[in-house]
Amino acid sequence: MFSALRSKNQSNKRSNDDSINSRKDVNELSLGAGGTSTSTNTNHNDSPSIKNKNKNKNKNKTENENIYKLTISSGRSRGTASNTTNANTLVLNAGVAIVGKAPIASSQNEIQTISGQSLQSGIDTNLMTAGFGRSAGIDSTTTVSHDANSVKSRLQRLPTITTSYKEINNGNKPVQVEPQDDSHYTSSLLVDTDPRSNNQPQSISSNAVANVEINRTLQLDLVYHESRVSEKLVMLDLKKLPHIKEGQLCELRTYRKRKSTSARSNKNSRDKKLYFIAHDFDEETRKRCHKFGNISVALGQLQLLLDLPPRSRVWIKPKRKEDTAADLIELHIKDILVNRGDMWCMSSELVDTCVFTGQRIMFLDSIRTTVNGIYKNGKKVLSGYINDNTKIVFRSESSRLLFIIQITNEMWSFDESGEQMFQKMINSFFPKIFNKWKDIETHHSITIAFAISMDMSTSSYKDLKPGQRIKNTTDYYRIVVDQVSVIYWVEIMESLRKEFMEITRELLSRKSDDKKDNELSVIKGRFAPVIKSNILELINFAATTIVDPFRQLDLRHTSTHVMIISPGKGLYDVDYDLLQLSCKKLLSLELTMDLICLSNPPLHVVPLFRYIDYENKLHHCIPPWLNIFFWNDKTKDTNKWTPRCQIYDLQMMGLTDTELVQELELDYLNPSDDINDLQTFLKDYDRDIFLPISTANFKAENISSDPDEEDLKELKKINDKTTTIHKSSTSRNTLTKSQRTNSEENNSIRSRKGDTIIKDPQFVGKISNSSRNNPPYDLSDKSTFEKQFKPKTTFHPSAMIKKTPENMKKLTNPVFQQQYFDIQTDNGLTGNSKNLLIKNTKYLTPIIDEPQTPLVTGNLYRTRFESQSNDNELNENSKLPERGGGTDERRNVSAADTLKDVTKKSSIKDFTQRIFTKFLATTKQSNFNSDGINSSAITEDAVLISDDTDGKTNNNNDFAVYPSSVADGDVSGDNQHRLNNKDSFTSILKPIPRPQLGVKIFKSDINNLSSNENVNSETKQNLLGTRNTINRKQFTASPHFTSSTKNSVSNHSRFIKFDSMDDWIEILEDSIPSYSFLGDDLLPTRWRDVWPKNVFRKYSKWKSFTSPAELPITLKRFPSKYELENNFMLRNHSVTQNWEQEQYKLTTKDLLRNMIYLRLLVGFQICTSSTIEEVESARKGDRDVFAIHKYLRGDLTGTFKIYMLMGSEIHRLHYDNSGTINVERYIEKSERNVFDQVPSYTSFVKTRYDSNYRKTDVDPIHTKRSEFNWNLLDQLLAGYSDPYLYDEWHGFRSKYVILPAEIPSNTFSMVVNGKNETLTTEEIRVEGLRKLIASITRLKLLSVEESKIQKDRKTEIQPEVIFYTGSLFDFLNEQQAQLDSSTLNFKDSIFGDVTKKLNKNIDLKNLAQELQMGENKLNLVTRKWHWKRHANCFVGSEMVNWLIRNFSDIDTRSTAISYGQKLMNDGLFIHVLDKHSFLDGNYFYQISPEFIINMNTVERTNSKNSNTSDNNTLKKTTSRNSTESNLTPLSMRNKVSTMDDDSTQLANTTSANSYKEKKTVVLSNSMLINVDPSSKSYKEELCTVHFDRVHNPEHCFHIRLEWLTTTPKLIDNMLGNWARICEKYGLKLIEIPWNELCTIPSVDPFHTFVQLHLVINPWEDPEFNDPELFAVSKFYYHIHLLKMSGFLLDNRASRFFQRDDADFEIMYSWGKPQFKYAQYIHTTGAYIAEMRENGNIFLAPNNVYMSRVNRANVISKTRSSPTFTVDSRKVVIEFSRTCYSYAKLRAVFLDAKEKWLSNKTVED
């Protein structure tokens, strides 16, 4: 029935092939009257197994079109279809079948036979509609042959295919069938599950129709649209695709023919799969594409990625969002500052969108990011969908990189290949990383410093024990380069080599103490080894740069990354207190850190820190905040053996292999005669080698089989399985057997003061003071052992108690001991006191009657717990296994020592009750003695868990349990499933109460139980839910395993999460080369969201080096409900939006967003842990867990909750419909300040241009992030307080100066009123400043009411800058005189009096009288400009403002200029120099003599009745957010009523009465501006700008910015606009530090400084010593030197303003001037100079500006040299030569002396 139809028999097909254009897909549908028809895939494009038979098609047609060829025959027929995977056959009535691509993706495709004249009811007509009738696309046609009438009649019965036709030709000629309207347009839309498949056609099953919405594949024709048409990347004609809805996720696939292998290698030739959100065509696109395509893709990035011509065929398929969401998205940013608040907002905008690799995303039309990586299920994919759970990581290609190179003794060593470590770094590492930066075109700013720790002791460090540090050390830091652009990488490498060669001479060479030969140098000290180096000190040193979150920002760089280069292997001995301090500090900083080791990786876990606690115990730990990489640039050879241990001494011996063999002969093993089998021998050998000596001494024949010795057998059995979990400082395996024996004996038997310690530390009893001289028990003596340690109760050990070492100092205090321990003097002990080891005679009374003695180590000792309800005696055979091969102080500690951890606030009774109520059963089986102590006892290191626990808990939660390992075969099926299932395992983690002692409990402690020994399930879950603490109450943080196998989980027993804050991970077995089973536990908790799931970290190392990540905005960590209630203090406050903010369109949603935004800026992260839902559901009142959000999207209509965490502080922000935002702050309780435990740290630093090392001005260890008053900050955001009223400003600040630059040639002339005006350079720059101020004024924030009023008022009145030359105080005195004479009596406001207006028809005499004597008269004053004085003149800009304010028919400045020119032509006024026409600017004009009114004959116009209020307004004018302060004249006011108390310090020498009369002069103006005038941002972007109102053109003009939650990129754009305005007028906008130069060393120790001493001291040199001159200006010669060298005055010293003869006090809008020294800026902006009191000049590079202008990438072959760079070194070198050259400096001073003698005047 389905016979093959050969193409040679299809004459009609061949005849039609010539009429078909060169199409890749031809679908032939055969309609037969006598039977069904099938289809054969002829593959014309995508089926590689079938050849293309349409090579000779018509060239006039377009490719990629689909045509359905319907062949009509009276018998059996066969059609062909291309691009079909499951070509489904739709069987119609009368046996006619349409063979093609049916819209179905189900596997249930069955042939349905239809009888009658209609479709089977089970088939949805929409199925056919989607497949054929309702699609848009290319102008395709249907070719019909044979009986056209039959075809017409049959097709008319299928309305979903075609409903009407314009024309059907009769006969057997092919007929072109076209639809009459678009709604029934037949196109080439196909449905397929896989277009690449060659499956035969199948029919549609009615059961499969239900699943067609998601899984169907649609074949569409592609067109492109421009971005001006639509910004959407992909659009669909959804009117013709009814099963796809707006906003639905779809998949787009491309399939293309692979012609060659080279084509496969081309990325553009590969098939692609992308995801997009379905958006409907807009009307323009629908009209344009209705005949050409169904899908439109935006031109640009996506078009280049697809690499398909128009009208190509693509396949789309609807997808489920939850199945397609990406795990992690990486966004790269460059040359911009994106803070974490904007990252949160950007992430919110990206949710529910699709991205593809390489996509450039624009945010606010300013922030450009590039999608660099999309990860899903451990794989990097091309495209992905972003949902709420997708982690979005921001990586910066323009970061500040800090390279800290450890200069240790090993830096001069050679590696195994013979290369010196330093040369390996300089010749391999740095060139490689510079090439990486060049390839990806990064713009990093680089700082490189050497960190050296000099050992000044006389003994060798080899004499120190592991964990001990060198006491007598001195730390040095050499700053090689500081914030240098990568474009200078050649100079950087030269500096590195040079400084390394000089470091030895500088630090090892010291001047001899011999007075006879002072020039003799001796070598003192030596470089410390890397293992004893200052690793934590240098980390704190690097962290000082980002301690202040509100430091002055570099608007072109994002994130700070520290890379520590070390010659070691990642093992360091550190101080315990300093480790705690560093961990606490790093938890609150946004600092990434990498450790790059130049050696080969060792065979132990790294990085590894060793420290000794307060009990002199050695610990190993992993700092998870430190990433480690081992640099090896050589290709790996698996067949070559590489040494992994330090064999440097052996390599340098020069011995040959023969000599080594002769000298290093080893004896053969002498096997024992009693070996029965190999397994026994290996078992005994391992036991003797690896187990403690005491446990290995047990012999089988010493253990009898009587019932009393069952416990001994059990002990022997357990000892065989025990593994050592604490390694000693020296590896046991490297010692000989005799050495190990001696070591163990020394560690086991050691007498201390008042102590008697049993040989085997597993058996420790409490011994009376009288028996201290008795010999220790001999465990080989069975009778003695049975007598003293006969077991009466066996226990199941389930926990380990970890002491809190930080409390030991308090507990060893005699006063404390006497208070809390019952002291007896008799030597006899009775009862149960024999088994407790007492350290001193005063501890003779039993503290705990029956301490639990079994200790848990390794896989733990498995015994049974049998509760003795009536037995209160101490178990004489209490076993205390050792923790490992440590020191005797660690291994032999009694239960009494454990009690030293009790704080002063608790008693012994309460202490023991807290312990036993946590772990022991409170049922009848758990008995307590008269003191309230449970009969089950505790030891130093173990607490036992009863089999019967009722779950009662106490409120003291001081420990956390960390799951460890499970022994093979010891886990039941249910428990094994929990352990192997990560989600299940995590779900059972429950918090339990914690006593005051830190406790370690392994997971294997619980899971090693047999079926009849299981602990109560609730207790077990509790144990698995918490972890150990070290010095404070901590959170619960669930561990995550990367492997679910039993072996990997079992290895986990060697690791313990030491602190639930994830400070570090304590290692009990350090000899583990791989720790992959720890998984995410080794990742920093705060940075865990940076790493993709299931991706090896080694693949991410170059990302960390080249594009470091910013701190993620989310983290999955949160304390349990119990911990939140008991370990945290609650502080709360409420915030409500100020109603005045509504006039600026600020809502409560804006306030909430700003509150979250601000917390993200200072380091908070949004908590996404599932624990939050449990905590929230347990709250009283509102328990809506669905109100917990991660992003703030949409309208704020319902309840909104968000949890944020930083360090030890949690914030809960809750908004309800009342409009109030409630803030709950949970602050972790802390009884110990770690910063008080570490002494001050002194180090020495030598910056780039220093000649000697100097003491640092900052203590990097004690420098920490300050705490914030969040109530105050939230109120500031709500608009209730003025931030300037507080002493300490919390916000961002930046300072800019305007310096002269080269003037463009076309700027010197300008046409005004038809006249060509030629301006001087000074006039051009002054005009540029006016234009800049006008641009700033246009950004002023206006309320809604002000915006409406300004439409009807004068809007072009601008605040003017008062320019002056000469002395500032002379100028201010003139201004004050004018104020006192009441000549300035008009209201200085942009809103003038609209009731009294003049017009242009006014008579000149009347106008002259209004100008001079009117109510709002013009300011006519005497002005001085460069040695010339001009009496009774006014400024052109003031005249323009006066005309606009007072004339009703003048509204614009241009109209005012034209009218002013008319008045000047009429002779009303003239230019003082008769040089210019009337200009709007700082040009002086005078009233013509014939219009001047004699002031002496006119009565004062300022009467008490009319102008009192105006004068009061003028005198009280402030410059902060005041329209009255926006204009000239200079504001002066009484100080007493408005200024703060601090300003009283400015005039201490004046009397109280005269002080009250002083006026306050404000020299700057402030204005609240909107940096987003185009309203592209999602929030109000506000900023306060301060600019000078008084300016000397020979000085710097200042602009200061202050903001809190404004987007930095918008500020950068605004500054760019201002910079372009300045460049047009020969000015340059330069950013400089906000604070004065002398304060920077105490903030940034990396900053480079130069202190210059003048070779000529003008105060002492007879040639220049002039008392008259120095009485006027002490620093006259110094100032002249700076001016001649190109420096301009920036800030005067504060003492300059504190003049006794001044009648006013000078203030600025940004605060009181408090500069200690005068500061100058070089005209290049590269250097800042400060003049010291002793005459020295202090120089520093302007790094904030240098990093902005020198941001070009590393010069590569394809890129030319940067067009503009500033070389700061040239400036300092030239100036230094002048200062140190007698001839050059004398010439400068002689020129200054000549000027003084000529005019005897000194300018400021």
From Swiss-Prot:
Keyword Membrane: yes
Comp. bias regions, Basic and acidic residues: 14-27, 779-789, 879-892
Protein's recorded name: Vacuolar membrane-associated protein IML1
Similarity section: Belongs to the IML1 family.
Lineage: Eukaryota, Fungi, Dikarya, Ascomycota, Saccharomycotina
Organism field: Candida glabrata (strain ATCC 2001 / BCRC 20586 / JCM 3761 / NBRC 0622 / NRRL Y-65 / CBS 138) (Yeast)
Biased amino acid composition, Low complexity: 1503-1516
Biased composition (Polar residues): 1-13, 185-204, 723-749, 866-878
InterPro entries: DEP_dom (IPR000591), DEPDC5_CTD (IPR045838), IML1 (IPR027244), IML1_N (IPR048255), WH-like_DNA-bd_sf (IPR036388), WH_DNA-bd_sf (IPR036390)
Domain of life: Eukaryota
Region (Disordered): 1-65, 169-204, 723-797, 866-892, 1501-1528
Cell compartments where the protein resides: Vacuole membrane
